[in-house]
Amino acid sequence: MSIVSLLNIDVLNNPAPFGSPYEFQITFECLEPLKHDLEWKLTYVGSSTSFEHDQELDSLLVGPVPVGVNKFVFTADPPTVDLIPASELVSVTVIILSCSYNDREFVRVGYYVNNEYDSEELRLNPPPKVQVDHVVRNILAEKPRVTRFNIVWDNEGEQGEEFPPEQPDADLEDDEEEYGAGEEEEEVEEEVEGETEADAKEDIEAEGEAEAEGDGDGDGDGEDEDLEEASDEEMEVVDDEVGEESEGEDDKEDKDDKDDKKDDK
């Protein structure tokens, strides 16, 4: 967590001639007492192709910093014209306002700056040599680009890093054996459960085979009660037929006897 938070920046003296000082009203909040000062710095980017032309316009140490909301005005000198390439004087560039604590940068604010001539005639027909006296700057204060960095503050540096306690007496091999034994017990239990399921499955299959062999009544004798009843009915029908045949033969014998007696007469 950042101990210092940037709340607001008001760009003063804008637009202004190229040679006028830069002015910023900065508001920030400090959450805890600080041992060191805050260093504010303004940098002018002289070229878009090389860092060699960057100029540090000014720096300011603010401190001691009280806890709470603080406000101050930061003023910086304009850049040196001779250190800027002629082709980069009248163009769009960037200024960077940054703040550091104990040589550690924790916030950076960038602004686009448009440098142009102050008259329409010079803008349409720029002279071969740049007339700096007629150049005005316009900082795009409504569109800043803010970048924040995490740094170590006073309280964080004193606490240091905490690590879990070492355990030199810990025996990893014993732990592995215990874990392995637990796994073996689980495997044995799974095998026993598997055998029980297999036995139950065999019993079900045996019952199915018994039914297929004809023991539909489930009494274990391998016979079906329905089949027994059907057999009794068939036997009655056979007896009736045999009786009818016997009666027919008796009638035939009586008729033959009568015929024999008639012939004797």
UniProtKB/Swiss-Prot annotation:
Major subcellular location class: nucleus
Subcellular location: Nucleus
GO molecular function list: acetyltransferase activator activity; histone binding
GO cellular component assignments: chromatin; chromosome, telomeric region; cytosol; H3 histone acetyltransferase complex; nucleus
Residue ranges with Acidic residues bias: 155-197, 204-257
Stretch list, region Disordered: 155-265
Record Pfam families: ASF1_hist_chap
One Gene Ontology term from the biological process aspect of the record: nucleosome assembly
InterPro entries in UniProt: ASF1-like (IPR006818), ASF1-like_sf (IPR036747), Hist_deposition_Asf1 (IPR017282)
Complex formation: Interacts with histone H3 and histone H4.
Function: Histone chaperone that facilitates histone deposition and histone exchange and removal during nucleosome assembly and disassembly.
Family: Belongs to the ASF1 family.
Name of the protein: Histone chaperone ASF1
Lineage: Eukaryota, Fungi, Dikarya, Ascomycota, Saccharomycotina
